[in-house]
Amino acid sequence: MGERKGQNKYYPPDYDPKKGGLNKFQGTHALRERARKIHLGIIIIRFEMPYNIWCDGCKNHIGMGVRYNAEKTKVGMYYTTPVFKFRMKCHLCDNHFEIQTDPGNLDYVILSGARRQENRWDPLQNEQVVPETKEVQKRLFDDAMYKLEHQAKDAKAGADARPVLQKLVERNMSVWDDSYMANSRLRAEFRQQKKEINGQQELDRQLLAKSSLDIALLPETTQDREMAALMKLQTKSALERESEQRLELLMRPALPGATVTTFGGLKRQKVLNTQLQVQDLGIRRKKLEETTSSATNEKPISLVGDYSSSDNDSNG
């Protein structure tokens, strides 16, 4: 029944086979909305970013594999291979960028609107297998001596790489000789890492709850610890010193002997910083003198009678 889905199409009663297919009869295209610019030689395709780029409009990074609805246009030929240009809009801003195929170098070229993140390198530097160019292939086919030299060079490269490959094979066999123990060690290491990750997440959660923040904390690095230590020893900036001087002037009273209760505890600080004068202690000294004089003027009480005055009266 599945093969009938492509054949069982509805044909209206007024369908005329002389006008061609069903799409031509209805005045539509098989690609529907994707072919709205077909009269300009443009079709809409789903384009996948071949490498990492930066948008020139919003300066954001766009990773390899991000897909866009792109306008595909044929702009030329490289021998018998067509060259296509793709125009698409950035999903983060209103900027458009254009990318064109480069069949000669097996690559894509950015024409406008973006710049490429350079991650290209020479494959010969990391001993990758590089396909031969057309010139080398032609020379290998025509020149027997060059082919012999080429084979000798390949044999030498294989002999140089054989010890390294042998060490890799031996290490792989030693590690996975006992698959149960290797799996146990790997799982134990994973459990230890999971405990450390959960502990760090708990510390981060407590710190965020204490500071009432809703941000994602990155892992602590050595540079962060060094910067935190330098922040403790950092001197105050000119702006901070100016702010402290301005606050000190605002807290200073207008009169020399006045005390101000504003700015929190300024009156107490003023009292502590004021030097006591002699007149401030005069009241206490006066009270002490009055008490001493009154004590000396009072007559002591005696149990023996004083008859000196009566004797004088009688003698008189």
UniProtKB/Swiss-Prot annotation:
The keyword Transferase does not apply. It holds the Pfam family Saf4_Yju2. The lineage of its organism: Eukaryota, Metazoa, Ecdysozoa, Arthropoda, Hexapoda. GO terms for cellular component: post-mRNA release spliceosomal complex; U2-type spliceosomal complex. One of its GO terms (biological process) is RNA splicing. InterPro entries: Saf4/Yju2. Residues 287-316 are annotated as: Disordered. Keywords: Coiled coil. Belongs to the CWC16 family. Residues 182-203 form a coiled coil. Disulfide bonds: none annotated. This is Coiled-coil domain-containing protein 130 homolog.
